[in-house]
Structures are given as structure tokens and as C-alpha cells.
């Protein structure tokens, strides 16, 4: 993943990607997938929820159907994405790095990342951070894309994105000390036979 292997290049990519994000994101991820992520996070009206790599707020909207917006905290590395999200929702949007989350240990009941891990330079570190800030017994849920079936799309996508296998996601969760690990593979959707893996684990 040469384009995003360091923070500076990653930030530059995100800044330009934000211009087309709202057009590209729905092509990769359906509402059904986002709802499944939120369902697996076991959120209720009293939950304090963190979304990592929240983008412009697509998954945040699904979270807000279950818990008040003031109980949702969202972190994204791109100021342009945060600005758009703030126009959509009244959740707590914070500019920050998935691999160095600006929160104390054991802060949140549930921690979610949907459609962001594929752009992280170090996904294992990001999942460790998600586990760190989640309360004992809380859920960590990550949605990750599968490699595109079309060879032309795949060749382009592999230059800017990571496509972790289900086994790789489970290994990252184990490394982060998570237990009760589960996963769901979803598809077909648009151009893909199997599009995503949604992995969850309990702290």
C-alpha cells in the first residue's frame, strides 16, 4: 500500500479524496452493511459510542437512530470530512488519528469503524487503540472491504487501499486482546460477489 504508508501522504490523500467521498462511499458500502455494523456493536440508548474514521457521517446516522447524538464521538483525520459531517449531525466530531486516539483508556461502551481501516497505514495499531478506549465487556466492530473481483478495478484499488482477509482481521483482533470474536461476510453488492467482512470482538 505505497500511497498510504506514512501519515503525511495519507493526510494528503484524504484531503483530495474528501472531494469525491460522498459519491464513492455509497458504491462500496450499503445501508444494510452499516446497520449490521451497528447491530453487532450492541448499542443501546445509554451507550457512549466512538466511531473511528467517521468520514462525512454515513454510519454515524445509523448510530444516531439508537443513541442521542451527544453520546456519539467521531474521529477522522481529515478536517474537510469533519466539516461536512458537522453539517449533517450534532455528534461530537474530532480531528484525530485512528492509530493514536485522543481518549483515556476504557472510555466507550462500543467502538466502531466502518469503511476506514482500508486506508490506515497500520491497521493492527488502530484496532489496538480501539480496544484500549473501550470499556471492559464492550464491543469493538470493524467493517473492512474485500478485494474487488474486476481485475482492472482491483489493480487501481490496491495502490491506495488495503484488502484484509477475514483471517487477517481475526488475527488483528486477537493481537489487540479481544475475545468472543465473530464475523459476518456480506455480498453480493454491485460489482462484488463478496464485498465486506464485519468483525467484532469483546474487550
What is the meaning of each model-derived region?
Residues 99-110:
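A short acidic, Gly/Pro-enriched loop at the edge of an enzyme's catalytic core
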Residues 110-122:
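A short SAM/SAH-binding and catalytic strip from SAM-dependent methyltransferases
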Residues 124-136:
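A short glycine-rich, Lys/Arg-flanked "PGG" loop and its adjoining helix->strand segment in the class I
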Residues 138-144:
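Conserved beta-strand signature within the Rossmann-like core of class I S-adenosyl-L-methionine
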Residues 162-177:
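Short alpha-helix
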Residues 185-203:
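Core SAM-dependent methyltransferase catalytic element
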